[in-house]
Amino acid sequence: MQIFVKTLTGKTIALEVESSDTIENVKAKIQDKEGIPPDQQRLIFAGKQLEDGRTLADYNIQKESTLHLVLRLRGGMQIFVKTLTGKTIALEVESSDTIENVKAKIQDKEGIPPDQQRLIFAGKQLEDGRTLADYNIQKESTLHLVLRLRGGMQIFVKTLTGKTIALEVESSDTIENVKAKIQDKEGIPPDQQRLIFAGKQLEDGRTLADYNIQKESTLHLVLRLRGGMQIFVKTLTGKTIALEVESSDTIENVKAKIQDKEGIPPDQQRLIFAGKQLEDGRTLADYNIQKESTLHLVLRLRGGVMEPTLEALAKKYNWEKKVCRRCYARLPVRASNCRKKACGHCSNLRMKKKLR
């Protein structure tokens, strides 16, 4: 029968073989065609590295199957694997090693079965059938090892429409994995998802364990709008700040953007919209804040001392009032008569005393 061998350069080699051929025989055929010594060849099929003494039939390799050829680098390299306990393991590997091979090496050193291992690099969970080279893992790179909990747990994801999704997960799942599960259930692409827990937006490369998300916890799903929108933030001094945001941004995110522009720490900011103070863990969508909406920024007072701008506002509010001498009703500064019937719309008014 005929099979194909694909190299990392994209070249495809056609080989005439039999199901009873050993992997060693196949490597010899590749040497005849391409001149690559068998000891520098690694053959991968269905995510597994093929062993020399086994046959094509052993791996269920049939006609027109495609094997992947990666070259064994002479000398190899050293990488590190860091566990959640802080322990660091040094491993001798080659760029052509599959993640499955790396897990086997970890098992040899630490006794952890491969099916309980999850390896993370640059915020991504590594897939068994891929190689270190596929992930651009080079000498002295550090991978992070998290353990796959047996049995897992159930968590819930609540959408803005009120729908609740149940997911089977493990504490070692990354946020990226959770988004993939949501995509499987709801068809929402991961790049349009934002997950919120305890008022914080969850980062793709972190795990549920990193955020102390436990069984039956509820995450909140908001959709990332393509292109975003512009809103305005008005301060008590009258200055207006324009911000580029998305409906799925949390109030905490908005405060961070204000800090970037104005240097005001988030813990000193209070944001007001439609007469309500906005809570950090909620999103702009929760408050129906849309494009070109205006939020009002007031500063959180430290130690009960009134900010100068707020004091000026209070004085202005008190100065520009009149008081009826009979019923003591507070009236607009332009009023000539009291609006209350009880005093007969008295015209005996005085200016309200100034705040000192």
Curated annotation (Swiss-Prot):
Placement of covalent cross-link Glycyl lysine isopeptide (Gly-Lys) (interchain with K-? in acceptor proteins): G76
GO cellular component terms listed in the entry, alphabetical order: cytoplasm; nucleus; ribonucleoprotein complex; ribosome
Entry-linked SMART domains: Ribosomal_L40e, UBQ
Keywords (A to Z) from UniProt: Cytoplasm, Isopeptide bond, Nucleus, Repeat, Ribonucleoprotein, Ribosomal protein, Ubl conjugation
Domain Ubiquitin-like span(s) in chain numbering: 1-76, 77-152, 153-228, 229-304
GO molecular function terms listed in the Swiss-Prot or TrEMBL record: structural constituent of ribosome
GO biological process, one term: translation
Origin: domain of life: Eukaryota
Coiled-coil regions listed in the entry: none
Segment forming the signal sequence: none
Crosslink position(s): Glycyl lysine isopeptide (Lys-Gly) (interchain with G-Cter in ubiquitin): K48
Additional facts recorded: Ubiquitin is synthesized as a polyubiquitin precursor with 5 or 6 exact head to tail repeats. Some ubiquitin genes contain a single copy of ubiquitin fused to a ribosomal protein. This gene is an exception, since it contains for 4 copies of the ubiquitin fused to the ribosomal protein eL40.
Family: In the N-terminal section; belongs to the ubiquitin family.
Name of the molecule in the record: Ubiquitin-ribosomal protein eL40 fusion protein
Lineage: Eukaryota, Discoba, Euglenozoa, Kinetoplastea, Metakinetoplastina
